[in-house]
């Protein structure tokens, strides 16, 4: 199975092969959360779904110390209720553009065709178009090129 680190405290895990041996993704996530708690005394949130977009939204949905599962059957309907700001890659500027077009939720975004979105959002249009349908084709990548290396020290005085 694959682990794609995103930051010090966040990662995507593809456990689709392990679930055949060890049970559901939810059971595995519960076990991982318990191990983190025992080892560090810290809580962790987990989002389980059939793609990275919905797994991230699920994780953010139930913080702190939550566990949220979105099935493939629930995904497309779930996405309709999301505010566009909850979609990956939608920051304040993109949200403002979408609002100017009358797009406030995933359901609103479903009313737009890809050719209509492309002039406004460029390359990102295809991602938004698919996201509104619960589709995310990005795969978990175990090996990624490191973007930066840093260390941090805290001193008694500045």
What are the residue ranges of the model-derived segments?
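Structure-specific DNA junction-binding interface
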Residues: 1-64, 126, 130-146, 152-155
């Amino acid at each position: 199975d694959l682990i794609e680190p995103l930051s010090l405290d966040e990662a995507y895990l593809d456990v689709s092969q392990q679930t055949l041996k060890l049970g559901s993704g939810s059971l595995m996530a519960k076990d991982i959360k318990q191990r983190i708690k025992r080892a560090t005394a810290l809580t962790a949130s987990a989002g389980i779904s059939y793609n990275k977009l919905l797994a991230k939204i699920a994780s953010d949905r139930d913080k702190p110390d939550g566990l949220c599962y979105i099935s493939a059957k629930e995904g497309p309907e779930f996405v309709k209720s999301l505010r566009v700001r909850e979609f990956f890659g939608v920051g304040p500027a993109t949200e403002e553009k979408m609002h100017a077009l009358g797009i406030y939720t995933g359901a609103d975004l479903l009313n737009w065709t890809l050719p209509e979105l492309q002039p406004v959002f460029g390359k990102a249009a295809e991602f938004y178009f698919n996201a509104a349908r619960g589709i995310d084709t990005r795969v978990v990548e175990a090996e990624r090129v490191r973007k930066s290396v840093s260390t941090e020290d805290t001193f008694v005085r500045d």
